[in-house]
Amino acid sequence: MHAALLLGFGASALNPYMAFAVIDKLVAKEEIQLDYATAEKKYIKAICKGLFKIMSKMGISTIRSYRGAKIFEAVGLSEELSNAYFGGLRSTIGGIRLDEVARDAIAFHDAGFAAQVDGLLPNNGLYAFRKDGEKHAWNPETISTLQLATRLGSYKKFKEFTSLVDGKEAPIFLRDFLDFRRAPISIDKVEPVESIMHRFVTGAMSYGSISKEAHEAMAIAMNRIHGRSNTGEGGEDSARFTPREDGTSLRSAIKQVASGRFGVTTEYLVNADEIQIKVAQGAKPGEGGQLPGFKVDQVIAKTRHSIPGISLISPPPHHDIYSIEDLAQLIFDLKNVNPRAKISVKLVAESGVGTIAAGVAKAKADLIVISGAEGGTGASPASSIRYAGISPELGLSETQQTLVLNGLRGQVMLQVDGQLKTGRDIVLMAMLGAEEFGFATSALIVLGCVMMRKCHQNTCPVGVATQNEELRRRFHGRSEYLVNFFTFLAQEVREYLAEIGVERLDDIIGRTDLIIRKPENESPKQSLISFDKILARVDNGAAIRHTIDQQHGIDHVKDVEMLHAAAEALENQKEISLEYTIANTDRACGAMLSGTIAAKYGEAGLPEHTLNVKFKGSAGQSFGAFLVPGVNFKLEGEANDYLGKGLSGGRIAVLPPVRSNFQAEKNTIAGN
């Protein structure tokens, strides 16, 4: 991290002389079994690997491009300090000045030499709770109280939990500094619990990263309350698409499409109420999901269309998204495959996320997720947990303001996640602009997670995040516990809405004028924080919450004509041949046709060679996308980019025009 910061601020070379001196001392004392030259080489290699990781997160390939780019945001530094010493680095909430930096430096120096160190430095609990260490929002007391409340079904106990969270001794999150205005009305006038629970979703945790039992418990609970669970980026077993005999459903309503595209088939997509394109996640922005090989058993490999025992690592970028136009095309493709599903895009809270969100709205996403840095840290790299991403309050407020400023807010829903736990959290996030709310860590804790931070090691002692059969038998979570949790949350939201004086959650969305700063005593440092930029309200007459649906323009695509002509093949599996001319304005040709077939016949599709379609001309982007078995496309001409994207068993042939005299090796007839 130190090297990344120095290079990012413009350094051309680094000399970590103290690190080299320490290595020299360790070699001399024979505490490491290497000669100095080898030890130094390995240290430099480790630093370089860390730099490569950071650069790849930002999509930067060369050190020349990274040097001086200042792709950072300051949190807690004053603008005065930032402008004077960091070249005007963005600092949204202000904070400490040079005086405070000097006092801290002296205090740390004095503490460092105050007493003799006995060899081992103390564990301050930066990543996991320690009794006298760093304060954590999830600690033994909050975890045990929440688990007890949801197991007993006790709302009184749940209020003890929220009192611990909302009344903590010192602020941990930005929202801990905030409160809201009150003008109470009768709670009988407030919308019911059931209506509020529709806004709740669980986080994108894949089957593989967590156990089958935990994944299915979340799906059952969310379907029961008419919320939505998320598959994560690991696909979903098709056996879960059909409700069980007792009426419960294991199907996750949200199907995620991540950069690795694990398990993404046409059948998978048509069994979704929402399809989520994961651009980034709050806990480790710029990194793809990473499932170690020892967690990939036969069933997980089958679900992800992979091989057992092989580590499954999603690349940082989607290889078909390098611009907003590319994203718009993927949204169009997915909407064609499943016209019923909403298409969402998951972004990380970061400096500049508002501009990105505006582009996503113009790309016709139905929903935008702003993922905060505080959540989803179970299996994330230590450096990402502490130093990547920013608070959801910062990302959400910037997104809300930018969308309203550009007149785009009305056509998209906004969802937020990042350590949401209580009704107060939900109400404050709604006032900052969110309409839906994601819960991941809290949902796992309700199911039994004790925050051991062993998610990536396959050794979770309570069977939540492991594929070890012996450990999975220790899983005692039940979907009923999650139903209790979300019911209690919604009830607490109702109580807060009554205190504020509104009847519906919709009435406070984007209403930052209702937010006030807590009047409690603050430390001198905390008093320097300013929330003016976060709470600024754009007053241009534009919508401040979702009011209209996106127009995706899929009513007149080529597939509508093909579906009508191929009705006999779809209904009776009768072999049919069709022929069409095609132009480059005909995009995602075959996607809607394939989605219709997959919805009816599943992964098997149609019998071989049932539907044979010949095209002549220049096909648009995503020709033959998600084509299913039994469908053969033959194109005489050329095709634009994304030919055969997500191919799911269909066949595509692209041939040059019959009378062309082009030299094949010198010409291209299909994009990448």
Residue ranges and their predicted role:
Residues M1, E233, K346-S351, G410-R424:
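Glycine-rich beta-to-alpha transition loops that act as phosphate-gripper elements at the mouths
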Residues M1-G10, S351-A363, K421-A434:
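Catalytic cores of alpha/beta
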Residues A3, L7, A13-N15, A28-G263, ...:
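Flexible, glycine-rich loop/tail regions that form catalytic "lids" or insertion modules at the edges
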Residues L5-L34, K41, K295, I300-T303, ...:
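Flexible glycine/proline-rich, aromatic-decorated loop/lid segments
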Residues V27-S56, R64, I385-Y387, Q400-R409, ...:
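Catalytic alpha/beta core domains of metabolic enzymes, predominantly
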Residues E160-Q401, L405, E579-T581, G602-F623, ...:
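Active-site entrance/lid segments in N-terminal catalytic domains of soluble metabolic enzymes
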Residues L471-R472, V483, L497-I500, I509-T512, ...:
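Long, distal/terminal scaffolding or interaction modules
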Residues R472, H476-F488:
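Anionic ligand-binding catalytic core segments
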